[in-house]
């Protein structure tokens, strides 16, 4: 199988790239038609592959379960198996995206796996902190030359514009791409 490079799609996109979580082939087609740069699936949604030319980013416990994908999300919180899973992904030709919730996880991921792509999530946000603020708090610790994806499933157009101004390369959402970018990528 020829894998499509998620990193290339993000880097070559105009402005901030939008990655959309879909559950089926229709969702993948709609996301592609709306201007998404990539599709996010669970490893169980492998039947999406024949219906899109966009790179597929899979969430899944084992790289083998994501064989139809082009990249796989690994959890930095899983320190015990992160390095072994990253090696297995490399053997399978899958790009690695390491999901981090805090500075400690980011430091561990950079030291032990050194991923090209880092997924910043707001899972560890304090109650008074917005998910957007949490992601933006993590961004300065991502080294230059790495691609940063923000995981904000309920992002608004204003959130996407703020993420782009801050230097985020892509945003992972669960919603309608057109509502976030309108006729194109936000101008900032």
Regions found by a protein language model. Give the residues of each.
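Active-site-adjacent beta->alpha loops and helix N-cap segments on the catalytic face
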Residues: 1-6, 41-62, 74-90, 104-108, ...
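N-terminal amphipathic alpha-helix/helix-capping segment at the start of soluble metabolic enzymes
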Residues: 1-29
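Short beta-strand/loop segments at the ligand-binding rim of alpha/beta enzyme cores
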Residues: 9-19, 49-61, 69, 87-98, ...
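Beta-stranded membrane pore/translocator domains
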Residues: 19, 27, 37-41, 97
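Glycine- and other small-residue-rich loops at beta-strand/loop junctions that grip anionic moieties
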Residues: 20-21, 59, 74-75, 98-99, ...
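Catalytic cores of alpha/beta
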Residues: 27-30, 62-72, 103-113, 144-148, ...
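Glycine-enriched alpha-helix->loop->beta-strand junction motifs that scaffold or abut catalytic
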Residues: 34-38, 52-55, 67-72, 88-96, ...
């Amino acid at each position: 199988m020829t894998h499509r490079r998620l990193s290339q799609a993000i880097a070559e996109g105009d402005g901030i790239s939008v990655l959309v979580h879909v559950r089926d082939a229709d969702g993948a087609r709609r996301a592609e038609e709306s201007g998404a740069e990539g599709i996010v699936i669970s490893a169980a949604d492998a039947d999406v592959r024949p219906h899109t030319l966009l790179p597929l980013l899979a969430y899944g416990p084992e790289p083998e379960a994501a064989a139809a994908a082009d990249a796989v999300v690994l959890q930095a919180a899983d320190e015990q198996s992160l390095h072994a899973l990253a090696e297995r992904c490399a053997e399978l030709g899958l790009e690695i995206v390491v999901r981090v919730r805090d500075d400690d996880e980011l430091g561990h991921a950079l030291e032990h796996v050194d991923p090209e792509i880092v997924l910043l999530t707001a899972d560890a946000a304090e109650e008074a902190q917005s998910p957007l603020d949490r992601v933006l708090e993590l961004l300065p610790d991502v080294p230059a030359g790495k691609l940063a994806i923000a995981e904000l499933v309920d992002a608004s157009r204003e959130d996407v514009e703020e993420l782009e101004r801050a230097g985020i390369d892509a945003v992972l959402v669960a919603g309608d791409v057109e509502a976030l970018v309108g006729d194109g990528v936000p101008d900032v």
